[in-house]
Amino acid sequence: MSPQESSVQPSQFLLLVGIPVASALLLAQCLRWHCCQWLPGTCRKPDDPEEPVSPSTPLPEYELPRQCPAPTLPEVAAFYQELHMPTQGQTVTRQMMHKLLVFSAREVDHRGGCLILQDTGISLLIPPGAVTVGRQERVSLVLVWDLTDAPSLSHRQGLVSPVVACGPHGASFLKPCTLTFKHCAQQPSQACAYSSNTSLLDAKDWKPLGQPGTHISRDECRILLSHFSLYTCVLEAPLGQTARKWLQLAMFCSPLVPGQTHLQLRVYFLNNTPCALQWAITNEQPHGGRMRGPCQLFDFTGARADQCLKLKYISEGWENVDDSSSQLVPHLHIWHGKCPFRSFCFRRKAANGNEECSALTNEIIVTMHTFQDGLETKYVEILRFQASEEETWAVPPPVSQPPLCNRLPPELFEQLQMLLEPNSVTGNDWRRLASHLGLCGMKIRFLSCQRSPAAAILELFEEQNGSLQELHYLMTSMERLDCASAIQNYLNRSPRGSPDRLHGGTWENHGLELDEKL
């Protein structure tokens, strides 16, 4: 072999080996960058800007992935059988197939009927004639507390109502049924009803409902159903506008007992709907937590600002155990209706045998401020919490069941609201009805600041358990013959042409069970 040949061999070797190796490394790097675009969070390009990191607050349990085994056919059959079993007018809360459900079921015939979920603001009315004469149908009304069943929303969309299922899925009737539930949107015109034409255990396919048959009032969504499925309400403002919804802030803690060294306070950020508060109460029951004081309203904006909870004052004798005096709730956790909460843990300071210091720790007073990040100078809510050892927490106070109150038929309610709303020069409007119901001038002035004073006073009449005959008499004595005529026309349309009678706290209309608001 010549010297020239022997000198070329190393360079040839480098070309043969180096080029494939370099190509493989370059290909691997390209694949890595490509995967970053499709799998956000797994890796990051070196030149990408760092994303802001929020304070280290543990994610709530609802954010953790759940691996649930696929249900078998017998399990699915047993699930729906239990869900549609008549509950004898009771509202049942139960964990079924990894879902926390609140439901009621009954049988209805040609006379119709009504299903109500207690303390949630949810009802389903099956009108007379919706079922063929001689047949009986089992129907169910379900509040779904499984947050994974809610629609997948963008940052511009907010969840403002519960997810409600009417069953059996796909059931249809001769006449439309009326589903009613509460929402917390500040502008009803920005809220839209959604439906998922799927069963409760299937993957959901949420789509907006059209306007016909859907009516969204100031705090209520009413849908005329041609068939049964899943329903909810979503808030989305037009471009250039800001969407807002009402929150209720609820504080919970366990009893403060002698010798207890620590106390945890939890603040829930909930949609301002009855069922959201019931969820928090149910969530606290296993831990012995009870609500402290009334809920406070909060004007929450969809401007993508996180919610801050800042500790401002702790009474003497107690100290904050947490590393920080402020907590942060991600905006979308609230905007998408995930019912998040944040907590502070407090510890008694050592008394050192000082009776005066020990007496100070028998009571704890806490003040907190909550606001959206960056908006502290514009809007802050102040939360005050107080607990003491002297309170009787050992035995829960007896729960007095409020008396049943009649609810005016929706179409009549709206007609009377429209007639009574305009202010009359003589005061012969909703204000006169308020006076007849015993309200003083100060309360009437307060009602005048409401979005619909007429609706508020009609709801008060419902809570006083008044009958249609009593309302007809009041309108006649007020010389509001237009309202009296509207009531009389409704009574004349009732079966057999006879007026409704009040019986046992419900409207008895010859077999038609109208809605009862608890």
Curated annotation (Swiss-Prot):
Gene Ontology MF term list: netrin receptor activity; peptidase activity
A Pfam family: UPA
Classification via SMART domains: DEATH, ZU5
Active site annotation, chain numbering: H227, S229
Gene3D superfamilies linked to this entry: 2.60.220.30, Death Domain, Fas
Annotated region (Peptidase S68), positions in chain: 208-235
Cytoplasmic side: 32-518
The entry's keywords: Cytoplasm, Membrane, Transmembrane, Transmembrane helix
InterPro entries referenced in this protein's UniProt entry, alphabetically: DEATH-like_dom_sf, Death_dom, UNC5, UPA, ZU5_dom
GO cellular component entries: cytoplasm; membrane
Record-annotated membrane-spanning stretches: 11-31
GO biological process: positive regulation of canonical NF-kappaB signal transduction; positive regulation of JNK cascade
Keyword RNA-binding attached: no
Membrane topology qualifier: Single-pass type III membrane protein
Function in brief: Inhibits NF-kappa-B-dependent transcription by impairing NF-kappa-B binding to its targets.
Assembly and interaction partners: Interacts with p65/RELA and NFKB1.
Descriptive protein name: UNC5C-like protein
Organism name: Mus musculus (Mouse)
The encoding gene: Unc5cl
